[in-house]
Amino acid sequence: GCSMGGACLTRMLALGKIPISRAIIDGGITPYQLPFLVRKLLLARDVLSFKMAANSRKILEAAFPPERFTTAGHDPKKEYDAMEAYLKTFSDRTIRNVFWSANNYALPKRPAKIGTKITYWYGDDEKNDRKRDIRFIRHYFPQTRIHGIPKMAHAELVMVHPEKFCRYAEKFLTMQAEER
């Protein structure tokens, strides 16, 4: 699971209801361990940031430069026109719900006992943004292998370089199969 999908995967692993032999958490978001009021302020920041990017092409392109975040062979203008139109379809309520649920989901105090091989990936360019998540995952799932991906930002590997993502995933899955 990548980003918010990583939050879903983290919860699935913690509950241990579905057997999972190996898991890749790619830049997964972990729940804030902060007071309610602080989490509400962070939610306001996230909603404001999203709305600014959705309503300003300049801000969107400053946050996600087209030359970096457009898949090879695709037209950046068409891609960003489509993204801009898509981002404007989100209601305020949806934006709030997405950010609140991704950052504040409930986990048991201790995860279920699972034998899952877990790796947590993050882009080296997002390392500072993921410090809290990495620390949480290391503590919560001590068996996790942490792996920085060189010269990548958040979700860049899977979105812009899917073939490279597949090579990393295949390497992890093959390595795990050999450890049995």
Where are these regions (language model features)?
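Gly/Ala-rich beta-loop-alpha elbow adjacent to hydrolase catalytic centers
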Residues: G1-L9
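Short, hydrophobic alpha-helix immediately C-terminal to the catalytic nucleophile
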Residues: T10-A14, C166
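Flexible "cap/lid" loop of the alpha/beta hydrolase fold
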Residues: A14-M52
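Conserved alpha/beta-hydrolase catalytic His-Asp/Glu region
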Residues: L34-P35, N55-A112
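Short beta-strand/loop motif that positions the catalytic acidic residue
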Residues: I114, Y120-Y122
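Acidic beta-to-alpha connecting loop that harbors the catalytic carboxylate
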Residues: D124-E126, M152-A153
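Conserved alpha/beta-hydrolase "acid-adjacent" motif
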Residues: K127-D133
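Catalytic histidine-centered segment of alpha/beta-hydrolase-like enzymes
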Residues: I149-E163
